[in-house]
């Protein structure tokens, strides 16, 4: 195989067929996830936070407090949805996921279907992105389809696609970001192949090659990673990893094309623009997700002191009071996640991180005891039933897939 042919690897010819297969699997995933998604008609697990935050963001522009969580949850089920106070809630996750939940609530109302609908949509889109990513990496539509089917039926992905939490949105944006980085790899290699055809050489003859500063897929990746970080902070670890991988792929492509020792310049000449596309764009996207907060923070109870004297006078002079207030708020969030409060919290159903990779203890989403016979499907005779919703993934699939990828 020639250098140009190796660089051109990945130009698949079944694009139309692959999209039909992708659409069919994604449709099945959507139908499975949307069926009876309003059950149970109550706020389960951490839905006690995010759907209520989303609802007040629609009406107040920020996350407001609900004075009695248990009473508020019961009231919401009965259709009483306005018992929040003007006081702002101290939230510990960025707003993107909550705005997406709010979209479903705006369309369908503040009910269990409304606050879960966006999760259904993004859980289905996650299947779509997984199919396309697996197809690109494997150069096989069949492998992509298998990946999509497996994710469609994975218990953890399925449950997370049917409750109003943030994780499914984060997962979608991360997979979309990784997919864009992989697309940039192919795009760059194909441009190098086109360049070699244009100059009429089978390789670069130790020349660095074209700069190719415009990288549309890297721009998309930066936006996706910014939205992922705007959902949950730990997305930044994936951003950092894929940034490094992306630059290494550029170096590898130039080396394959015949740049020789000049390929090492890729870490500077391709690396600096990559930093801008991925990190700077992600940061700007992340800041944009806080736009509503920057407008409303002076009206929040915890922000009233910020409406007067600046929280950080020195920083305020440099970036302005709104951004200085946002920085101070981020410092408080970081302290919450890493401080003594979180370190000392306990839970009767807590699981040790060492068991997460094998799901030693499934994630308990909801449990109802004492269901009487002939009610809610209970067929017990002379006894009662227990109904449990658990987010249980497929560790055997995860680990065998990882081993197979390593041995490929």
Which sequence ranges carry the predicted segments?
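Aromatic-rich transmembrane-lumenal/periplasmic boundary elements in polytopic membrane proteins
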Residues: 38-75, 282-361
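Membrane-integral, polyisoprenol-dependent glycosyltransferases
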Residues: 1-291, 379-408
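Juxtamembrane membrane-water interface segments that cap and precede transmembrane helices
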Residues: 357-391
